[in-house]
């Protein structure tokens, strides 16, 4: 399910140390107890949840691949006609292997896996990686989606795409969705995203992702950007697939073949 590729600098987090399962998760991901930490990890209904301690009215953040919005998108989101599917090159007889180099909460990775891609998620923030692993655990146990989730979706915890390159596997597509500062005032930004951004910060080194992504991918690199953002690292893409608020910049290296 999860491969730990390298140690990460410990991050402080608040949790109830009387719960062995929480303590074990924090030890596994290099999270150290900090009573002054802004964030807290808790278990709610067999689900690992991240809460922002100074905003108790905000809903906690968790990863749920089985129900909720991502499940609705899997069932009713348009299948392979979705822009993200076109961007990675999904078509009849072609199910690319994909590395999501900026996994976040795993939603785009899940869409691609549900459409037939084998997806390896890379997440360098250990708190987010812990949430992802918990989401995968519950998805793997699901009667509805468990079988194909175990086959198509996994997590690698590491600080860079080199973590995947070390595995020595051939990767068709590298998918990147770097955190980009919102243009709107903070009150207009979705609350969950605001909390998430305050945890992980902006990807200030995002431009440095394109070169290793291009080296790793054998077929193409796909970069998801807000419609107002500049090209990643100033490099013009081979083609652009636009949606209402975002676009997918596609850097083609070789044709997809069935």
Swiss-Prot record:
GO cellular component: cytoplasm
Pfam families found in the cross-reference section: SAM_MT (PF04445)
Family to which the UniProt record says this protein belongs: Belongs to the methyltransferase superfamily. RsmJ family.
Residues engaged in binding S-adenosyl-L-methionine: 107-108, 123-124, 159-160, 177
GO MF term set: rRNA (guanine-N2-)-methyltransferase activity
Top-level taxon in the UniProt lineage: Bacteria
Gene name per UniProt: rsmJ
Keyword rRNA processing listed: yes
Name this polypeptide is given: Ribosomal RNA small subunit methyltransferase J
Subcellular localization(s) per the UniProt record: Cytoplasm
Enzyme Commission code(s) on record: 2.1.1.242
Protein task: Specifically methylates the guanosine in position 1516 of 16S rRNA.
Main location as per UniProt: cytoplasm
Organism: Shewanella sediminis (strain HAW-EB3)
Catalytic reaction list: guanosine(1516) in 16S rRNA + S-adenosyl-L-methionine = N(2)-methylguanosine(1516) in 16S rRNA + S-adenosyl-L-homocysteine + H(+)
UniProt entry keywords in alphabetical sequence: Cytoplasm, Methyltransferase, rRNA processing, S-adenosyl-L-methionine, Transferase
Keyword match S-adenosyl-L-methionine: yes
